[in-house]
């Protein structure tokens, strides 16, 4: 408990190795076993088409979570990064947002857990779009009117992945607080609310992470360089960015062919004899 699956696997391998060396077992039970990583179908990774995104946002505007959904669509933040966003990570003068921590609710243990971003590359500073800036500025300007629960008096500690030192997350400094409870909204509650909005909008249901996928797809469609997108998403590998996060729509295929057609080759003539 408390260890990642990867760390648990390392400890298990060491345990079996030591048992074999001390003649407690005849052979390592996993000798000769090879694991293959399941191929994930592209269609299983959901994202929103432009039409579905528009329909979703029209309905979501009436939601108290609209700002959270819209900010992810504008920045590509992970859900935990959005929930753990604090005001000291926002620079209104430079119009940037810095990702340096996450926050999630552990349902099994019933507590909030602060932590570092997913990987070393996940530490990043994101330039804000005008829409993202306006969202954050409006929340900042109205922060004195929000409801606050006693939970916000807590300060959570976590280990900075870059330095190995202890850092703190001050709960009262969180950007997003549930309007009804005065506490941060739990990860799962966002998905539950999303499903209701999808049903109301008449589109297929999707989870919070699909908004991050949608951001990546819109970014490439707008002409953003893949390497730039990789940095903005906080990926260690460009392969992850392009293979897992960027989705090709029928409209983008058609647009790409039209752009190719417009670039020239006008000297190519149809040979009537060969047609």
Language model segments and positions:
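C-terminal secondary-structure termini that scaffold catalytic or DNA-interacting sites
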Residues: 94, 105-107, 112-123, 130-132, ...
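Short, basic (Lys/Arg/His-rich) helix/loop patches that form interaction surfaces
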Residues: 58-63, 75, 126, 142-231, ...
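Small-residue (primarily alanine) positions within well-ordered alpha-helices
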Residues: 6-7, 19, 241
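Catalytic-site neighborhood detector that most strongly recognizes the C-terminal catalytic loop/helix
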Residues: 39-40, 47, 103, 214, ...
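Single conserved hydrophobic/aromatic residue that forms the stacking wall/gate
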Residues: 1-7, 11
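C-terminal flanking helix
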Residues: 13-16, 20, 253
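Basic, Lys/Arg- and aromatic-enriched nucleic-acid-binding interface segment
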Residues: 21-85, 92-93, 104, 121-123, ...
């Amino acid at each position: 408990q408390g260890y990642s699956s990867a760390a648990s696997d390392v400890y298990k391998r060491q345990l079996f190795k030591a048992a074999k060396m001390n003649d407690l077992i005849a052979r390592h039970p996993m000798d000769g076993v090879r694991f293959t990583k399941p191929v994930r179908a592209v269609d299983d990774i959901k994202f929103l088409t432009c039409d579905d995104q528009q329909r979703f946002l029209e309905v979501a505007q009436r939601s108290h979570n609209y700002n959270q959904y819209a900010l992810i669509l504008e920045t590509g933040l992970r859900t935990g990064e959005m929930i753990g966003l604090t005001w000291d990570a926002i620079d209104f003068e430079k119009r940037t947002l810095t990702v340096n921590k996450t926050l999630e609710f552990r349902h099994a243990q019933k507590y909030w857990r602060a932590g570092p971003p997913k990987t070393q590359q996940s530490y990043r500073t994101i330039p804000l779009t005008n829409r993202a800036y306006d969202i954050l500025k409006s929340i900042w300007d109205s922060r004195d009117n929000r409801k606050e629960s006693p939970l916000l008096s807590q300060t959570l500690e976590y280990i900075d992945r870059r330095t190995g030192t202890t850092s703190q997350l001050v709960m009262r400094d969180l950007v997003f607080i549930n309007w009804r409870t005065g506490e941060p909204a739990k990860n799962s509650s966002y998905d539950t609310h999303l499903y209701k909005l999808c049903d109301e909008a008449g589109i297929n249901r999707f989870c919070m992470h699909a908004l991050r996928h949608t951001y990546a797809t819109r970014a490439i469609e707008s002409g953003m360089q893949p390497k730039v997108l990789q940095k903005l998403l906080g990926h260690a590998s460009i392969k992850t960015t392009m293979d897992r996060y960027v989705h090709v729509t029928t409209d983008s295929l058609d647009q790409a062919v039209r752009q190719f057609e417009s670039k020239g080759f006008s000297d190519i003539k149809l040979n009537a004899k060969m047609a």
